[in-house]
Every structure is written in C-alpha cells, then in structure tokens.
Amino acid sequence: MSSQFDQLKLWSVLVGDSGDPDLIKTLDVQDATTNPSLILKVAQEPKYQSMLTEAISWGIRQNGDDVQTLTFVLDKIQVNLGLEILKYVPGRVSLEIDARLSFNTEAMVQRAIFLSQLFEKMGGDKKRLLIKIPGTWEGIRAAEVLENQGIACNVTLIFSLVQAIAAAKAKVTLVSPFVGRIYDWWIAAYGAEGYSIEADPGVASVANIYSYYKKFDIPTQIMAASFRTKEQVLALAGCDFLTISPKILEELKKEQQPVERKLSVEEAKKLDIQPVELSESVFRFLMNEDAMATEKLAEGIRIFSGDTQILESAVTEFIRQIAAQEA
C-alpha cells in the first residue's frame, strides 16, 4: 500500500509549511507558505547570510530614509526566499505583508502591490505568488482591492466561519484557517487534557468552512494550516489544500495505513446550510461574540508583528555594520 502522504495527495494539494528552501526541496510538495516567524528562523541561519546581505545591500541602494530602507530590505528578503523556494515546488508560494498593517486597508494594498511588483521585477511569475493578508475586516477589504487588480491573495489567520464568509464575498483566491491554534485555545480555555479527533474544535472549524463553501459553489480555495498532529491532517483529507510542517509530512510518508476521504463536495451539498449575509457591523459583532476567534486573531497578529520587529532589529544592526565598513 502507498504511504499516507501519497494517499492524501489523491484528494488534497499538500503544501510545505517552511521558509527554508533547503528543507522545502526534500518535501515533495506542490506549494509552500511562509510567515514572519518562519522567515526569522531562516534569516538567523548562517547558510542564508549571503541572501540576507544581498537584500540589505539592495535596500540601501534604493536611497530611501531609514524606515523605507528597512521596508525595502524586509520585502527583498521575502522575495529572495520565495524565489528560491519556487525552484523546488511546481506551484505557488505565499509571502506575507507586515502584520503591523493589519488594520490599515490602504497601507496593506500599497505594501502588497510593492511586494508583487518586486517579485516580478526579480524574475518571479505573478501566477505563482499569493500575498498573505490577515483576516481582519480591513485585511479582507485590502484583499478585495488586490484581487480586482490581479494580485492573488491568501487571507490568513482565519479562526471563524464569519471570516471565511467575508473573504469569500470579497472573492479572494484562498483562505487559511488555523486548525492547531483553535485547538490550543479550547485546551487552554477549558482545561481539557485533549479532544478526540471527532470532537477536535480546530478540525470542526475547517470542516464547517469547507461545507459552507462547497454547498454554495464558492470558488475560494481552503488551505487548512497550523496542524498539531498527523491525525488532524488525516481528519481533513479532501480539503482543497493542507499546509503541513516538515515533521508531520515525514510522519505521513512513513505510515501506510489506509486514508479515508473525510471532506467531499458531494457530502457538503447534502447539508442543510443557510447562506449568511454580512455587513461590516455584522462581521464585527459576530467576531466579538466569538471569544476564541477574536483572541486568536489578535494573538496571531501580535506574534507575527513581534517576529517582524525582531527581524527588523537584526537587519538594522547589519545595516549599521555595512555603513560602518563603507565609511
């Protein structure tokens, strides 16, 4: 019998959850996704220092002020990594805009346009790029503008059906609901020792989004993310995309037990689901009613923002060293 990895590929596109090109090329996945936390890890590795140095030198040559130079460098690092990753996957790579812009629609639009243009300028194929935008109301509005300009978006930090519906109404390319972080919240909030896979709240959240989308023929793709266990992955077999850590991917490659498809369009069509109408006020109210989604969205933005600031500090020190050498 084939591995669980190969069986999963019959129903879902598998995505590598890593910003490390050397690791990605060993995974045999279709797509790859990065985030500030992953990029920070890569930037701290000696083998990628030349890539970091090149990005810094490029940023300095743009002759911006200190803030602009830092922005140029951070985006160039992402593009460098993204282009390197695309050498090893046949599909797309997701690059993320600065999480500190999460509540500023216009700033997110401008940053995403710059990132997309830089990606193309450096030789990237725009069709192979997804821009990751946080699932705030402002982020979803930014994604709507970008999609209308031909820039494909991955709306990330999805913790609720209401976010997913809002993103679908904005006609975004893809959403990323976070299985493991939802699971973590329920464990912490209620002191549970764990949930069976049948009762896993993270798995249930993604399944609900999948059912809603397929019931109403919504073309927005679903890329389940943030898995804690192999069992969570298998429980969502059939989801459009599954973005999986290298550790769990290796576990799937070693196991050969049969994999059963859990999600299908045919089954979703049978469900009694009513369409939801959303305005900004309804979106904000429903998010406010969902403590888990509100808290995890805020936490996710803080984590990505914090890692971006750490990366900025490292880059600032590199810039200072380069300036001192050239003085």
UniProtKB/Swiss-Prot annotation:
EC number: 2.2.1.2
A single MF term (Gene Ontology): transaldolase activity
Record: active site: 132
Catalytic activity: D-sedoheptulose 7-phosphate + D-glyceraldehyde 3-phosphate = D-erythrose 4-phosphate + beta-D-fructose 6-phosphate
NCBIfam families named in the record: talAB
Gene behind the chain: tal
Biochemical pathway: Carbohydrate degradation; pentose phosphate pathway; D-glyceraldehyde 3-phosphate and beta-D-fructose 6-phosphate from D-ribose 5-phosphate and D-xylulose 5-phosphate (non-oxidative stage): step 2/3
Family classification: Belongs to the transaldolase family. Type 1 subfamily.
Keyword tRNA processing: no
Protein's name according to its UniProt entry: Transaldolase
Alphabetical list of Pfam families matching this protein: TAL_FSA
Domain of life of the source: Bacteria
Keyword Plastid tagged: no
Taxonomic classification: Bacteria, Pseudomonadati, Chlamydiota, Chlamydiia, Chlamydiales
Residues making up the signal peptide according to the UniProt record: none
GO biological process: carbohydrate metabolic process; pentose-phosphate shunt
SUPFAM superfamilies with a match to the protein in the record: Aldolase
Matching InterPro entries: Aldolase_TIM (IPR013785), TAL/FSA (IPR001585), Transaldolase_1 (IPR004730), Transaldolase_AS (IPR018225)
Organism name: Chlamydia muridarum (strain MoPn / Nigg)
Compartments where found: Cytoplasm
GO cellular component, one term: cytoplasm
UniProt keywords, alphabetically: Cytoplasm, Pentose shunt, Schiff base, Transferase
